Amino acid sequence: MKKVLFLLLCTALTGCSFHTISNVSQQTIDVHVRVSDWQYTNMIDNNYFRCVIDMPEITSHVFNQGEVQVYRVFNRNTADAFKHVLPDVFHQKEVLNGETFLYTTTVDCLYGIGWLEFNYRVSDFVYDNGNYGDFAPKAMDFSIVITKSY
């Protein structure tokens, strides 16, 4: 019993270690995506809109040891402004030509070294027939927070 207790005590005291990062800096970049910036992918069974931007701030160091957090900003520059962390999922109801559509819109992002891609998807592929104009994304604002650790 003493051996088991001794082994548990040794494991508990030496098994965990903490690495403290003492130098951290953050940078916030505001991005406005215009309606004309969204590109329709038109891929079979995976249709969505996307907007790719250059992000030289996402270096290999940030990619491997830092963090990138993206927020969608609503009502920017107003007293009612608020942010929502991506992914951003909203349930929608829309009536077009007397027909009711229930669907979900999702805004998310991908990033790599030097770039960031915003994606806008509508559930159930409601624009599979090529008539996606009514479901195209509007202009959107985003805040990108890049955290670097040294």
Where are these regions (language model features)?
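Bacterial Sec-dependent N-terminal signal peptides
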Residues: 1-6, 15-35
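Repetitive helical segments and hydrophobic/amphipathic motifs
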Residues: 11-12
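First exposed extracellular module after export/assembly in secreted or surface-exposed proteins
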Residues: 25-150
